[in-house]
């Protein structure tokens, strides 16, 4: 046996036994609605994995606050929309709202983080008005 490979081979069974984190991502953010509809803000999550993702106890933190209740499952290829004001959202979109978040997304920039039930970061998005965000993202 090659002695340089030995440390890697010892760690191999451990690495193979660690389950992969679900691939749920923050897919889309609508943070800057017209002034008269500031509560139209929403966040879309997507599960691109071939398996459903149990997102029970997962939270959105930093810019907004939301926690998924027990028995929350995002199907394979599925989407869920969370909004600041589900009633206002329903006036403009046909999609069903999966929950209402607290606080507001910053109009000129913010960070949104998705953490699992153990507090581990699953995905994080930071946005703002500068590059690489196009000016048209602000409705200009």
PLM ranges: what are they?
Residues 1-5:
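Positively charged n-region of N-terminal signal peptides that target proteins for export
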């Amino acid at each position: 046996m090659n002695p340089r490979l030995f440390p890697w081979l010892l760690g191999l069974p451990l690495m193979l036994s660690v389950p992969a984190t679900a691939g749920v991502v923050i897919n889309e953010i609508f943070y800057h609605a017209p002034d008269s509809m500031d509560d139209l803000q929403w966040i879309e999550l997507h599960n691109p994995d071939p398996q459903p993702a149990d997102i029970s106890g997962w939270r959105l933190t930093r810019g907004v606050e939301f926690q998924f209740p027990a028995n929350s499952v995002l199907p394979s290829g599925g989407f869920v929309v969370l909004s600041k004001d589900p009633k206002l959202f329903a006036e403009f979109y046909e999609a069903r709202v999966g929950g209402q978040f607290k606080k507001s997304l910053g109009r000129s920039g913010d960070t949104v983080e998705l953490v699992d039930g153990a507090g581990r970061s699953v995905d994080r998005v930071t946005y703002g008005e500068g590059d690489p965000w196009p000016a048209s993202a602000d409705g200009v």
